[in-house]
Design a protein with these regions (language model features):
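Active-site loop architecture of trypsin-fold serine endopeptidases
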Residues: 168-169, 197-198, 233-242, 263-276, ...
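Short glycine/Trp-rich loop-beta-loop segment that forms part of the substrate-binding cleft
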Residues: 246-270
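PDZ/PDZ-like groove recognition
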Residues: 167, 347-417, 425, 430-452
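A conserved glycine-rich beta-strand in the N-terminal activation segment of trypsin-fold
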Residues: 131-141, 156-184, 209-211, 244-246, ...
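Catalytic-histidine neighborhood of serine endopeptidases
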Residues: 63, 67-70, 182-224, 228-231
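Interdomain regulatory linker/hinge segments that flank or connect interaction modules
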Residues: 120-130, 259, 319-366, 449-452
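Gly/Ser-enriched beta-turn/beta-hairpin loop segments
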Residues: 162-170, 217-221, 232-239, 281-295, ...
Length: 452
C-alpha cells in the first residue's frame, strides 16, 4: 500500500512539473516597414537583373547570330583585263585581205579585184530616205536597249536659311550600272552630285526609285561608285527591267573612226543622247599617279556633259568628262578611255581606298633612251607639293625603275603597281637620278597615304 501511494505521489509531481513547463508562444507582430523594405529590395534586384540580362542579350545576340549564321560577305568585283582587240573596220579589212590572198592563190592575176575597184563599187551605192529611216530606227532600238543600263542619280541636301526655313537642294547626274556583288547593285556616276549629301536617290530607266549610299570615290577623275541594296529591289525588276553594262576596251588600234553612241547627259540634260564617231585618241590627261587616254568625238554637246560612250557592240568604251577638250573644241564630247579606268572602277566597286604617292610622269621613249641615255622606266615630270614622294626626296627628272620587287619600265606599270597597294603600306622605290653625265641608282622607303 505504501508503495502504491508513493507511486501516485510521484505521478502527481510529474504532472505538476509538466504543467509548469508548458508555455504559450505568441506570434511576432508583422514589421510593415521591414516587409516594405525587403519587397523594394527584391523588386529592385529583379529590375537590375532584367536590365543586365537585356544588355547582355543586346550585346551578345549579334555576336552569337553571326557565329551561328555568318553573314555572307559581298563578292569581290573583278573586271576582265583587256586583250588586244581589233575594230570592226580592221576585221573587215583583214577579211578582205584574206579573201584577196585566197583569190590570188586560186585565180589568175587578171581576175583579181583591186582595192580601187572595190572603192568604185562602194561609191556607187546611194542611200535613199528609207535607208536613213531604217538606220535611225535601228539606232533607236539599240539606244532603248542600252538605256536599261542607265540611271539618274540625285543627291539631296537639306539646310536652314536665315529665317529658319528648311531648304532642300538637289543635284543630278547620270550613272551606269556596272556590277552587282550579291548584296548590292553598283553604279558608276559623277562624284560632285553625291559629295557630302544627306540622301542619294537612284531613278532607273522605268521610273523605279531606290535609295543608295556612297561606296567609294576617286578624286583624280571625279568619279564615284554608289550602291543600291539588292533586297530593296523587286526580283522581277532585277531580272527583266535592268541590264548590267559590259565594260569594253578603248585599247583598240586605229580606234579613230569607230562609231559610238553617247548616253546619259551628253547635251547637259539627263536622257539626252548623241551619235558620232571617235575622231582622236592621241591626247592624254595626267593626274596624280596615273595618266588617262582621252577619246575625242565629233558629237557636239554641252560643256557640262556627262554619261558614257557605247560602241555598237553594247560595250562601254568611255566615261564622258568635261574640261578635257582642246580650247577650240570645248563643245565636242570627250571621254576617258575605259581601259585606263577599269582598275580604278574595280577598287571603288570593292570599297577600297586609293593609295597616294603624288607623282605625275610619262614613259621613257626609245629615242630618249638611245640618244640621251635615259633608262627605261617611269619618268617623273612633276612631284606634287607635300606629297609622300616629295617628303621622301623624289625629284622631277627621276626615273622609277623599281616598285618593291617589281621592275618598272613604263608609267602604266608604276600606276598598276600603286593600285595594288593600300594607304598605310610602305614600299621601296628604286629610282635612277642623273648625276653629271650618268644616272645613279637610289632607293627610297615611302609610306603611302590617302589623296585628300
Amino acid at each position: 500500500m505504501a508503495d502504491s501511494q508513493e507511486n501516485k505521489q510521484k505521478e502527481q509531481n510529474d504532472v505538476s512539473e509538466k504543467n509548469f513547463m508548458i508555455e504559450k508562444i505568441k506570434e511576432r507582430p508583422v514589421n510593415k516597414k521591414k516587409l516594405l523594405r525587403r519587397t523594394l529590395i527584391t523588386a529592385s534586384m529583379a529590375v537590375i537583373f532584367g536590365l543586365v540580362a537585356c544588355f547582355t542579350f543586346l550585346v551578345l545576340e549579334p555576336v552569337i547570330s553571326n557565329w551561328l549564321y555568318p553573314e555572307e560577305e559581298p563578292q569581290v568585283v573583278v573586271f576582265p583585263e583587256d586583250q588586244d582587240e581589233m575594230s570592226p573596220e580592221q576585221m573587215l579589212a583583214e577579211n578582205m585581205q584574206q579573201e584577196n590572198q585566197n583569190s590570188q592563190s586560186s585565180s589568175v592575176p587578171g581576175e583579181v579585184m583591186e582595192q580601187e575597184q572595190i572603192r568604185e563599187l562602194l561609191s556607187g551605192i546611194i542611200l535613199d530616205l528609207d535607208n536613213y529611216k531604217q538606220i535611225y530606227s535601228a539606232l533607236a532600238q539599240y539606244v532603248a536597249e542600252m538605256n536599261r543600263s542607265m540611271v539618274t542619280v540625285t543627291g539631296v541636301s537639306s539646310g536652314v536659311d536665315w529665317f529658319n526655313n528648311v531648304n532642300e537642294s538637289k543635284n543630278q547626274s547620270s550613272g551606269v550600272i556596272i556590277a552587282q556583288n550579291g548584296k548590292q547593285l553598283l553604279i558608276l556616276t559623277d562624284y560632285s552630285p553625291v559629295k557630302q549629301v544627306d540622301d542619294i536617290i537612284v531613278t532607273f530607266n522605268d521610273g523605279t526609285q531606290a535609295d543608295a549610299s556612297l561606296k567609294e570615290k576617286d578624286e583624280t577623275t571625279g568619279l564615284a561608285v554608289i550602291a543600291v541594296e539588292l533586297d530593296t529591289l523587286n526580283e522581277d525588276f532585277l531580272k527583266n527591267d535592268i541590264t548590267i553594262a559590259t565594260l569594253g576596251s578603248s585599247n583598240i588600234k586605229d580606234i579613230a573612226g569607230l562609231p559610238v553612241v553617247a548616253l546619259g547627259r551628253p547635251m547637259g540634260t539627263n536622257g539626252s543622247l548623241g551619235y558620232g564617231i571617235i575622231t582622236s585618241s592621241a591626247s592624254e590627261s595626267a593626274a596624280s599617279d596615273t595618266t588617262y587616254r582621252i577619246l575625242q568625238t565629233n558629237i557636239v554637246g554641252s560643256q557640262n556633259a556627262g554619261g558614257v560612250l557605247f560602241n555598237l557592240q553594247g560595250q562601254v568604251i568611255g566615261i564622258i568628262t568635261n574640261g578635257k577638250s582642246a580650247t577650240d573644241m570645248k563643245n565636242m564630247v570627250c571621254a576617258y578611255g575605259i581601259t585606263e579606268l577599269k582598275r580604278h572602277i574595280e577598287k571603288m566597286s570593292n570599297g577600297e581606298k586609293f593609295a597616294y604617292l603624288g607623282l605625275k610622269g610619262v614613259d621613257v621613249t626609245a629615242e630618249a633612251n638611245s640618244e640621251l641615255r635615259v633608262p627605261y622606266g617611269a619618268y617623273i615630270t612633276e612631284v606634287e607639293m607635300d606629297s609622300p614622294a616629295m617628303l621622301a626626296g623624289i625629284q622631277q627628272g627621276d626615273v622609277i625603275t623599281g616598285f618593291g620587287e617589281r621592275v618598272i619600265v613604263s608609267f602604266d606599270e608604276y600606276t598598276n603597281s600603286l593600285l595594288s597597294m593600300k594607304p598605310g603600306d610602305s614600299v621601296e622605290l628604286t629610282i635612277m637620278r642623273q648625276s653629271q653625265q650618268e644616272y645613279k641608282e637610289m632607293k627610297f622607303d615611302i609610306t603611302l597615304t590617302v589623296l585628300k
